[in-house]
């Protein structure tokens, strides 16, 4: 009798193992490429992975760090990865030039773009920027919208001195006193400099003074959207849950990211970055909506601004459907 029970138990375990393996084989292998090396903004996707939200949707998810939104857009367009998390303005420029990609959900609906400096500079509003030296990176998204920000706030470009450099050079210019401010994202550069120096920074957000563009979102190839819309829907469903869980427990989200990538950064800095990101998920119009659900007028206004200042053909104005679909976040 005992021998029979032992055989039955072993058979049951084997059956469960087989069922588990079969279930794993049935999951869709999916790669999400981020826009950059890990920082706090990326934490929700790792929390979704840790909590099994993607697994529950039949997705075996791998998250890859990126090397800039441009590279992420190229990888999605080429079919090297299924999804990308990227700057939507960068995607719009690529799509306008023929890249077969589209956004399927907008996470950052308020732009993190800002002019920032140390708090002791007492720069709290656009007028305080007059007479200051600002470090910029020529050709990036911030530098393209900087003249618009100045114009809307009645500041002549000649009233502000600029120095040029990449992200590291800009940070060093501010830290070393060669510049009063730099153009950067409030959820990225700001916490890094605060960690580096131990001094508080203050940011003047473009979005608070007339220049708001939708920022980062999930992108997919038009081929994937057409051939496997159900996969896109499942991925977005899991991602929406992941962001909602992050808002409730940001510390857990940071811990989940560090579990996968222990070298992602200082936990405190990552948490500061995430805390600065969460308020960017919604505008006043979408504050009661779920994550990734954006107002179409905000997509349209961003496209218009990109057409006017970002190098996109003016013929693209108003053609929101070429760049974004709300089908998968309903």
Ranges and model annotations:
Residues 227-309:
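Secondary-structure end/capping motifs
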Residues 1-9:
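Bacterial N-terminal signal peptides that target proteins for export
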Residues 25-166, 170-176, 180-187, 204-206, ...:
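Short, glycine-/small- and polar/acidic-enriched structural segments
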Residues 9-19:
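Bacterial N-terminal signal peptides
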Residues 157-161, 263-275, 312-320:
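Short, surface-exposed acidic
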Residues 299-330:
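Conserved C-terminal helix/tail region of periplasmic/extracytoplasmic solute-binding proteins
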Residues 89-90, 169-173, 177-265:
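Pocket-lining segment of extracytoplasmic ligand-binding domains
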Residues 103, 162, 246-257, 315-318:
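Surface-exposed patches in mature extracellular/periplasmic domains of secreted proteins
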């Amino acid at each position: 009798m005992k021998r029979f029970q032992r055989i039955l138990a072993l058979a049951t375990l084997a059956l469960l193992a087989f069922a588990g393996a079969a279930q794993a084989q049935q999951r869709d292998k999916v790669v999400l490429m981020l826009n950059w090396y890990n920082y706090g903004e990326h934490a929700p996707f790792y929390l979704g992975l840790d909590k099994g939200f993607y697994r529950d949707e039949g997705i075996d998810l791998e998250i890859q760090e990126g090397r800039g939104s441009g590279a992420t857009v190229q990888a999605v367009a080429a079919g090297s990865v299924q999804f990308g998390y990227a700057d939507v303005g960068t995607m719009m420029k690529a799509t306008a030039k023929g890249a077969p990609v589209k956004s399927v959900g907008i996470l950052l609906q308020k732009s993190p773009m800002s002019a920032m400096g140390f708090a002791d500079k007492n720069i709290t509003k656009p007028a305080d920027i007059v007479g200051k030296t600002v470090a910029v990176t020529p050709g990036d998204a911030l530098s393209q919208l900087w003249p618009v920000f100045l114009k809307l706030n009645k500041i002549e470009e000649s009233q502000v001195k600029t120095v040029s450099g990449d992200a590291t050079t800009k940070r060093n210019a501010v830290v070393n006193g060669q510049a009063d401010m730099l153009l950067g994202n409030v959820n990225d550069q700001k916490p890094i400099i605060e960690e580096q120096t131990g001094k508080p920074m203050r940011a003047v957000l473009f979005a608070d003074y007339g220049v708001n563009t939708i920022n980062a979102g999930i992108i997919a190839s038009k081929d994937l959207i057409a051939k496997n819309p159900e996969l896109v829907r499942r991925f977005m469903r899991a991602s929406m849950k992941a962001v909602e869980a992050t808002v409730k427990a940001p510390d857990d989200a940071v811990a989940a990211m560090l579990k996968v990538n222990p070298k992602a950064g200082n936990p405190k800095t990552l948490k500061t970055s995430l805390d600065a990101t969460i308020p960017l998920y919604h505008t006043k119009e979408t504050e009661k909506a779920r994550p990734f659900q954006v107002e179409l007028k905000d997509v349209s206004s961003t496209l218009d601004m990109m057409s006017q200042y970002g190098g996109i053909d003016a013929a693209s104005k108003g053609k929101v459907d070429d760049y974004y679909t709300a089908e998968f976040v309903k």
